[in-house]
From Swiss-Prot:
The keyword ATP-binding applies. PANTHER family: PHENYLALANINE--TRNA LIGASE, MITOCHONDRIAL, PHENYLALANYL-TRNA SYNTHETASE. Mg(2+) binds at residue 252. GO terms for cellular component: cytoplasm. Binds 2 magnesium ions per tetramer. InterPro entries: aa-tRNA-synth_II, aa-tRNA-synth_II/BPL/LPL, Phe-tRNA-synth_IIc_asu, Phe-tRNA_ligase_II_N, Phe_tRNA_ligase_alpha1_bac, Phenylalanyl-tRNA_Synthase, tRNA-bd_arm. Keywords: Aminoacyl-tRNA synthetase, ATP-binding, Cytoplasm, Ligase, Magnesium, Metal-binding, Nucleotide-binding, Protein biosynthesis. It is an enzyme of class 6 (ligase). Tetramer of two alpha and two beta subunits. This is Phenylalanine--tRNA ligase alpha subunit. Belongs to the class-II aminoacyl-tRNA synthetase family. Phe-tRNA synthetase alpha subunit type 1 subfamily. HAMAP family: Phe_tRNA_synth_alpha1. GO terms for biological process: phenylalanyl-tRNA aminoacylation.
Amino acid sequence: MENLKALTEQALAEVAKTEDLAGLDAIRVNYLGKKGEITAQLKNLGGLSPEERPAAGAKINEAKQLVQNHISERKAALEAQAISAKLAAESIDVTLAGRQPEVGGLHPVTRTLRRISEIFTAVGYDVAEGPEIEDDFHNFEALNIPGHHPARAMHDTFYISPSHVLRTHTSPVQVRTMKSQEPPIKVICPGRVYRCDSDLTHTPMFHQVEGLVVDKNVSFADLKGTVDQFLKSFFEADVPVRFRPSYFPFTEPSAEVDIQCTNCGGEGCRICKQTGWLEIMGCGMVHPKVFESCGVDAEEYTGLAFGIGVERLAMLRYGVNDLRLFFENDLDFLNQF
């Protein structure tokens, strides 16, 4: 019992001098643990008389409590210092220049769609839209596509039900426009379309812009002039254009439109398959059967129509060789535009 006071003072001195929590815990174990020096004083109580034990035990417990209180206070002080040091190290310098947020850009297909629309609306075309799920009449019958036509086959068309499909073109919007408006009509119909196809140059979903002009005395010369002027405006160059006879059930006569290869200048390369030309769009004069289905007098009015594959134009404009890249959401690819 003689050294209890000395042990207590020694413990308090060590507590006051320690600078870290690990050292503080070591002091606690050394003095107050099961084998600690102050705790060991309790073993000496057996050598005292019964009258002396209560007073001696009380002194030992008081010493333990005193040391424990100092340890708790020192621990709180060290933890506060640690928090203050951490806050100081992590403080924000408000005078530093801020980081600019990353700003997104328009998708190349969206850019191309907007460019096409701007070219046509600048010369008086309206923009019309329609549903992407179409009935048989608007997607096929009204466009002179009979029941035996191969375009109706399951391997070409996504059927929602026996009488409804995901539209295979935006031509149904033209049908709805002719049924709801009186000529003259001058409209483009942009939108998503769907076909059962997927490879380097085809995807199950893609975008089209179809155009329609219905008025008196509209001729194939008007169609050629419209297409030629559009392509020159889109590519911002005097690109050579050629028309080839073709077949579409909803136009007569019909034509495929080619432009001189933008990669080789007509010399022949891998992109144009050594022909020097690239197929770019289809067009023709509206078939009288289509006018009949839409309630337009084919004796009084004629019409021109054309269809543009938006991704096809985007590939040529931006030099993209795989159509599927447009739909993979690859930021490294999209950030180039």
